[in-house]
């Protein structure tokens, strides 16, 4: 694990953070001018009403920071390309969702089936290329036990479930100032350790880049938030987690590393089903 560590990982975190810190002061006023502000329903809590009009789509700077830092400091392997593809694919879905809600004033954004179709396509492409070109197997690794089980074609179903579950979990957590970005910083640092353990240095660089971008974003997103990441950021960051879980064969470890997201999702499910 220590042998796999190199300074490019630290530089990637620093570079991603600098991109976010440099872009933020210019992007946030532009989002204000374009009226890319978040709408808060009138029946919501008074504390949330103050957030009405706060620019959203701040995830643009996070994704930009991660992408630039990864391309500079990581070798552009198929694994890195797939990781970026998962993130950028969900970034596009999130951007379209935010644009429809904020600019076109259609509160529901993309239809659920449209999002699911996009995620289904991303999952199939990643799984097919991963299995055929990176040595990705259809085995599932059980954490702590260390056993692997070949689940055959059902692995495609698992990948789709991981993508949809993880991205929506991060999306649900993006309701409080700094919560999603802070939780993602912790989770990405955890995955950096996982990548180092499995000697996947380039994916570790990608993880460190995510860590740096999320920590820097807290400057603008910590209470009181000057900008929200929006679906643009939350879906993309969910894609980061899901992609790392899939490419390191630690899909089930996501439940632990993304523990806060799991708790938040369960909380929402309990609240919805109890009414």
Regions found by a protein language model. Give the residues of each.
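Alpha-helical transmembrane segments
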Residues: 1-30, 62-92, 126, 154-158, ...
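Membrane-interface helix termini and inter-helical loops of multi-pass transporters
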Residues: 1-2, 103, 134-147
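Cytosolic, membrane-interface loops and tails of multi-pass inner-membrane proteins
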Residues: 26-51, 96-108, 269-275
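Alpha-helical transmembrane segments and immediately membrane-proximal extracytoplasmic
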Residues: 40-54, 78-79, 202-206
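Short aromatic-rich membrane-water interface segments that cap or initiate transmembrane helices
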Residues: 53, 143-154
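Hydrophobic alpha-helical hairpins/lids featuring a short glycine-rich hinge
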Residues: 76-111, 115-116
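Mid-bilayer segments of alpha-helical transmembrane spans in multi-pass integral membrane proteins
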Residues: 91-96, 120-132
């Amino acid at each position: 694990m220590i042998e796999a560590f190199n300074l490019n990982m630290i530089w990637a975190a620093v570079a991603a953070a600098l991109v976010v810190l440099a872009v933020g002061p210019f992007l946030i006023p532009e989002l204000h001018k374009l009226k890319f502000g978040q709408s808060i329903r009138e029946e919501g809590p008074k504390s949330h009403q103050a957030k009405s009009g706060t620019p959203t789509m701040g995830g643009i700077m996070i994704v930009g920071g991660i992408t630039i830092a990864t391309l500079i400091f990581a070798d552009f392997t198929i694994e890195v390309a797939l990781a970026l593809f998962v993130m950028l694919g969900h970034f596009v879905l999130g951007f379209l969702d935010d644009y429809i809600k904020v600019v076109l004033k259609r509160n529901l954004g993309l239809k659920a089936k449209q999002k699911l179709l996009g995620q289904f396509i991303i999952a199939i492409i990643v799984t097919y290329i991963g299995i055929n070109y990176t040595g990705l197997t259809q085995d599932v690794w059980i954490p702590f036990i260390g056993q692997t089980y070949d689940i055959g074609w059902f692995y495609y179903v698992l990948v789709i479930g991981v993508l949809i579950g993880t991205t929506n979990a991060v999306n649900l957590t993006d309701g409080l100032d700094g919560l999603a970005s802070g939780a993602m910083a912790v989770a990405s640092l955890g995955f950096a350790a996982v990548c180092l353990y499995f000697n996947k240095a380039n994916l570790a660089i990608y993880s460190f880049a995510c860590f740096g971008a999320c920590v820097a974003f807290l400057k603008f997103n910590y209470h009181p938030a000057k900008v929200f990441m929006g679906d643009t950021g939350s879906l993309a960051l969910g894609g980061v987690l899901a992609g790392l879980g899939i490419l390191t064969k630690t899909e089930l470890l996501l439940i632990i590393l993304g523990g806060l997201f799991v708790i938040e999702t369960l909380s929402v499910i309990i609240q919805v089903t109890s009414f």
